[in-house]
């Protein structure tokens, strides 16, 4: 049976703990799993959403406004709306983080649409991916 809360996008996994419907749009919370040597997503900023990253295991590298932060288990990083950022795992083990975004404008529907656009035969249509990002308030940098 398929886990409705798990969304696979390329090599990364999103497992929703609270989605936009459960919180009436107040927030979303999910586990974000990134395999070694993976970079996701493209540099962007959120027009209307703040993000908090809490390291669960491994080390997530997040570049925020040009400065690299290494987020290990138990460490936290706040990403205010409007700040350009990207996530990657530059290390040899899988990284897992708890992500909370408020308000819950970038939720399950966004990630399901991204999965449909990314998980295709051949190369994804980058312009289509950017259009989905913009629709949900993520602005490619």
Feature-to-residue mapping (PLM):
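A short glycine-rich, His/Asp/Glu-containing loop-to-beta-strand
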Residues: 7-43, 49-50
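Short, conserved beta-strand element in jelly-roll/cupin
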Residues: 31-35, 45-63, 101-102
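Short beta-strand His + acidic residue motifs that chelate non-heme Fe in jelly-roll/DSBH
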Residues: 42, 62-63, 79, 85-91, ...
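Hydrophobic small-molecule pocket/channel-lining residues, especially in calycin-type beta-barrels
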Residues: 46, 60, 86, 109, ...
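Short acidic-glycine-tyrosine-enriched beta hairpin
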Residues: 66-82
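Double-stranded beta-helix
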Residues: 93-141
């Amino acid at each position: 049976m398929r886990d409705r809360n798990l969304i696979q996008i390329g090599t990364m996994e999103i497992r929703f703990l609270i989605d936009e419907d459960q919180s009436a749009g107040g927030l979303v919370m999910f586990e974000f799993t990134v395999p070694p040597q993976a970079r996701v997503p493209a540099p962007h900023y959120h027009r209307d959403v703040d993000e908090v990253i809490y390291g669960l295991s491994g080390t997530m590298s997040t570049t925020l406004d040009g400065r690299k932060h290494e987020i290990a288990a138990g460490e936290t990083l706040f990403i205010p709306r409007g700040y350009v950022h990207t996530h990657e795992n530059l290390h040899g083990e899988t990284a897992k983080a708890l992500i909370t975004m408020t308000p819950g404008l970038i939720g399950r529907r966004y990630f399901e649409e991204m999965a449909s656009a990314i998980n295709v035969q051949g190369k994804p249509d980058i312009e289509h991916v950017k259009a989905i990002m913009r629709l949900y308030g993520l602005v490619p940098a």
